[in-house]
């Protein structure tokens, strides 16, 4: 899980690529909020690549600083309205600006250390979006379990 791709896992564990991919396909990892209501959430986005460097995919996610958990995330275009309508459909709370983003920016760094597909100048990317989402689901579940 520490920044290892499918071929790295094959080499370390001695499994075939097909076996590792089958395990990813069967994976049921999902993040689930541990609370019904959060007092403050920080939201940020960053891009990753699927297939090739020209194909950017945006990840928009919500982070709770006090628990260190990733509460929700959505993949899509870098469209603020679409992201907030999807993730925070019921939210009527006030929004806080960029002055309070130190924690989530630090979390972005932690994500980049854990998931190689999130590294800015990486040669590691998923060919199909399906595997990309599976790897991030596992990575986020792992990050949440560590907190």
Name each model-derived stretch.
Residues 1-147:
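Residue-level recognition of single "structural anchor" positions
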């Amino acid at each position: 899980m520490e920044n290892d791709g499918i071929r790295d896992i094959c080499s370390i564990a001695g499994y075939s690529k097909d076996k590792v991919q089958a395990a990813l396909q069967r994976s049921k990892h999902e993040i689930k909020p541990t609370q019904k209501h959060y007092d403050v959430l920080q939201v940020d986005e960053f891009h990753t690549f699927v297939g090739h460097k020209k194909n950017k995919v945006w990840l928009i996610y919500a982070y709770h600083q006090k628990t260190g958990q990733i509460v929700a995330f959505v993949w899509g275009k870098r469209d603020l309205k679409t992201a907030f309508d999807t993730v925070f459909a019921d939210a009527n709370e006030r929004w806080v600006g960029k002055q309070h983003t130190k924690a989530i920016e630090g979390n972005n760094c932690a994500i980049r250390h854990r998931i190689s597909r999130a590294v800015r100048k990486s040669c590691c990317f998923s060919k199909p979006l399906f595997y990309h989402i599976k790897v991030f689901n596992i990575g986020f579940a792992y990050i949440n379990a560590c907190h």
